[in-house]
Amino acid sequence: HKGTICVDTQRVLNTQDSFDDRSNTERLVAGVCRAVINMGYNIGGFDAYVTSEVVPSAGVSSSASFEMLIGGIINDLFNNGSMTIKECARAGQYAENVFWNKSSGLMDQIACAVGGAVYMDFKTDGDVTFESFDLPFRSNGYTMILINTGKGHADLSAEYSAIPLEMYSVAQSLGCRRLCDTTKQEFLNNITEIKGNDRALLRTLHFYNENERVECVRKSNDIEQILSMIEKSGHSSWELLQNCWCEGAYKEQRITVALALSNEFIGHDGGVCRVHGGGFAGVILAVIKDSLVSSYVDKMSAVFDRSNVRRIDIRPYGLVKVKDM
């Protein structure tokens, strides 16, 4: 069949085999399988017919959702459901780190596995705690819309990796390894002593302020307060984190064009928008009043094409077996 993939278990068991001759999808399957074996669990053969409505390369965790599907199938068929959400997520992370050579964390995998809006805390080094909570957009008359502005033509690897590296450098100047090991006030008290990279200072300030905004949203049921935090987060990403365009391709700013046009179309009380995903290219997220959705979609479609403007919702279910629901 067209699109059929097949992963040989014997190759998975060979730890020297990195599946370099196979497709990205096959490498993910192999990576998840090997991670499961490394954790001491079982794998086996199965046939699966897979369809998806997750948009690829759009900041909505398409690879992580596929990894969690494969991990969930293996967990149910061969391990009696004994693998935890964290273990399934780590299997997906391993697949990307080792078989894709991509420095993925656990955020996307946990979000897909848990379902709903998910609060995550990575303060304990090497671990994550998480809980699901509600974002009351639909019940308050708002719709989420993703606008895919295009991939861009720059290699984004250096742009992505520079963000944590610069934050690590500031943390080191403050005498610790990570920014969460110290405080915003300690950073502000010593800001004149940290020299050589002003962008790193701005990104550090974003880190501390963003964590405060996350805590506010998690604890709030006030839709206006939640929207305000999203709007402030978007401005901070644009101004402080600076992940809305690529330094080496400054003439290509589709993200900032989409944000600027959205703000024009939305007005002062029609909703909010921000860069989505890793940034630098790709997708923005808009949360729009239902009464303005059709007009907003039409206007953004005229610029970015209708196929790139999608109404979305947050699925309340994570990694589940349908018959158990």
How should these model regions be labeled?
Residues 1-24, 35, 42, 119-274, ...:
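C-terminal nucleotide
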Residues 116, 280, 315:
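A generic "binding-loop/recognition-motif" signal
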Residues 1-91, 255, 261, 265-266:
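Anion-binding (especially nucleotide phosphate/pyrophosphate-binding) glycine-rich loop
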Residues 58-146, 323-324:
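Fold-level recognition of mixed alpha/beta catalytic cores in primary-metabolism enzymes, strongest
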Residues 278-285:
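N-terminal pre-core extensions flanking Radical SAM catalytic domains
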Residues 2, 50-56, 89-99, 124, ...:
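Acidic, glycine-rich active-site loops and adjacent beta-strand->loop/helix elements
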Residues 28, 50, 66, 88-91, ...:
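Internal, well-ordered alpha-helical segments in soluble enzyme and binding-protein domains
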